[in-house]
Regions:
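Membrane-water interface of alpha-helical transmembrane segments
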Residues: 3-11, 80-87, 110-117
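Alpha-helical transmembrane segments
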Residues: 6-23
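Hydrophobic residues within alpha-helical transmembrane segments
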Residues: 12-15, 59, 88-95, 115, ...
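Core segments of transmembrane alpha-helices
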Residues: 14, 60-75, 124
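Cytosolic, membrane-interface loops and tails of multi-pass inner-membrane proteins
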Residues: 22, 26-56
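Mid-chain, well-packed structural core segment of small domains
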Residues: 66-99
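Interfacial loop-to-transmembrane junctions
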Residues: 99-123
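Juxtamembrane boundary at the C-terminal end of a transmembrane helix
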Residues: 128-139
C-alpha cells in the first residue's frame, strides 16, 4: 500500500460534496420551474421546498463531522501513519457518508440515517485513536 492511499477516501468524500452541490442546484431549479419557490427565497434559505431542503441539509452535514475526517487523514499522511487499517477505516467513513447522504436526500428517515452516522462516527474515533497511538510510537 502506498503512502498516498489515505488520500483516496478524502477524494471520494469530495466527490460526494460535488454531487450534493449538483443535486441541490437541480432540485432548486426544479422548484423554481414548478412554481414552488422563487430564486430570492434561496438567498437567505427561507421557506425552502422539502426536496431541496433535504439536499441543502445533507450538503451542510458534509462540513461538520467530515472536517475532522480530513484533518485526521492529512495528519496520518503527514506523519507516515496511514497503514492498511487506517486506509480501510477511512474508506468505511467515506462509505458511511455516501449512505448517510443517500438516505438524507431520499426518504430522510432517521432510523436509516442514524446507523450510517454512527458507523462514520465510530470510524472517525478509530482514526483519531490510530493517530494518537502512531504519534506515541514515533515520539
Amino acid at each position: 500500500m502506498t503512502g498516498t492511499a489515505i488520500l483516496w477516501p478524502m477524494i471520494a468524500h469530495a466527490g460526494l460534496v460535488v454531487a450534493l452541490y449538483a443535486l441541490l442546484g437541480l432540485r432548486r431549479g426544479a422548484a423554481v420551474k414548478a412554481g414552488k419557490a422563487r430564486v430570492s427565497q434561496f438567498r437567505e434559505n427561507l421557506n425552502e421546498p422539502e426536496d431541496s431542503l433535504f439536499a441543502r441539509n445533507s450538503l451542510s452535514n458534509q462540513f461538520e463531522l467530515p472536517v475532522l475526517f480530513h484533518v485526521v487523514c492529512l495528519a496520518l499522511f503527514a506523519t507516515d501513519g496511514a497503514g492498511a487499517w487506517a486506509v480501510a477505516v477511512a474508506w468505511l467513513f467515506a462509505a458511511s457518508r455516501y449512505v448517510h447522504a443517500f438516505v438524507h436526500v431520499t426518504s430522510n428517515r432517521i432510523r436509516h440515517r442514524q446507523p450510517a452516522f454512527t458507523a462514520g462516527f465510530a470510524a472517525l474515533i478509530a482514526l483519531w485513536g490510530m493517530l494518537a497511538v502512531h504519534l506515541l510510537r514515533i515520539a
